[in-house]
Amino acid sequence: MTATPAWTIQKPTALLVLADGTVIEGKGIGATGTVQAEVCFNTALTGYQEILTDPSYLGQIVTFTFPHIGNIGANDEDIEDLTPAARHGAVGVIFKADITEPSNYRAAKHLDAWLKARGIIGLCGIDTRALTAWIRENGMPNAVIAHDPAGVFDVEALKAEAKAWSGLEGLDLAKVATSGQSYRWNEKPWVWNEGYSTLGETDAAYHVVALDYGVKRNILRLFAGLNCRVTVVPAQTSAEEVLALKPDGIFLSNGPGDPAATGEYAVPVIQDLLKTDIPVFGICLGHQMLALALGARTEKMHQGHHGANHPVKDHTTGKVEIVSMNHGFAVDANSLPQGVEQTHISLFDGTNCGLRVDGRPVFSVQHHPEASPGPQDSHYLFRRFLNLIREKKGEPALAER
């Protein structure tokens, strides 16, 4: 990979320093400072605010493969973390082109100002295609991203920092990303020209308890849109506390970090919840937590799956869906025990993307059916979960699609 082009005379104001000693120079954007993180790439063309505020990206620097990011500005609605002030999302960002002036009727501010407010350190003006190709070849590297408007850097110290960081393996970041308190969620999905509406107390027909490992807002909105009263509880909530809320269904949320580390406290809770006949649905980290609770294993991926254009096959329907993905760990399909069926696979690399327990109202997926951003091919999974709740109540099933 090359640093700044040879014809550039501007002094670099940001550096990306990889653990192998590679130094990439560029122009600084967003917040100033230095942070250690894992570098990944995302292939989505749109939805950069939702990507950067997704708690699953905590501990990561996101490289956008699409060259023009920020030209529709930033707004106060396209946010996915529950507590924006806590900044539970990506810690760094890399763009090909500099951020232009925004042009969109929803824009409330320039993306650079928004990045500063979020504390996201950024770099632009580099060959993101070369960086992406490097990641595909070598895997997601540990790195340091640094931004100093004066362009003053201790490169050797940054190299040492990048090399010394242990990476995401073994890190329980769910305890950081979780909201830390129980609360009721009633905001419904966004509607054109109307914005967000709320679910009335009398309209709530079902009660879902969501274990928050770093949950995205749009997941909760889709539950509310199906007339579910959602109670969000912290990641370390006990099974007894969950069951005391008398849920009709239990949801295991997405989140960041190493599932094996989070599983040290989450797996025993889920195993106790599985002793009941309450329907259980998991997404992303929640899928991995469920797999661990059932006796399977998880593993670190080479380059991860990050984007809004990933093909997945649903073996339960035979259909191929284009979905959003964001994960750097995966369930080892060969470790799934007897009685647990693999329901979805990635058509990029064949990795596991879903499971269900035979004869039980329990299933999960690795991808993000709520999208935000991305296609809505998998929205039916929320109705599938609701139908498990309805079946338990003796109510007829709704059409999934």
From Swiss-Prot:
List of catalytic residues: 284, 368, 370
Stored InterPro entries: Anth_synth/Amidotransfase, CarbamoylP_synth_ssu, CarbamoylP_synth_ssu_N, CarbP_synth_ssu_N_sf, Class_I_gatase-like, CPSase_GATase1, GATASE
Pathway in which the depicted protein is active: Amino-acid biosynthesis; L-arginine biosynthesis; carbamoyl phosphate from bicarbonate: step 1/1; Pyrimidine metabolism; UMP biosynthesis via de novo pathway; (S)-dihydroorotate from bicarbonate: step 1/3
SUPFAM superfamilies: Carbamoyl phosphate synthetase, small subunit N-terminal domain, Class I glutamine amidotransferase-like
Keyword Plastid: no
Segments forming domain Glutamine amidotransferase type-1: 207-395
SMART domains in the cross-refs: CPSase_sm_chain (SM01097)
Complex and partners: Composed of two chains; the small (or glutamine) chain promotes the hydrolysis of glutamine to ammonia, which is used by the large (or ammonia) chain to synthesize carbamoyl phosphate. Tetramer of heterodimers (alpha,beta)4.
Protein name: Carbamoyl phosphate synthase small chain
Organism: Rhizobium meliloti (strain 1021) (Ensifer meliloti)
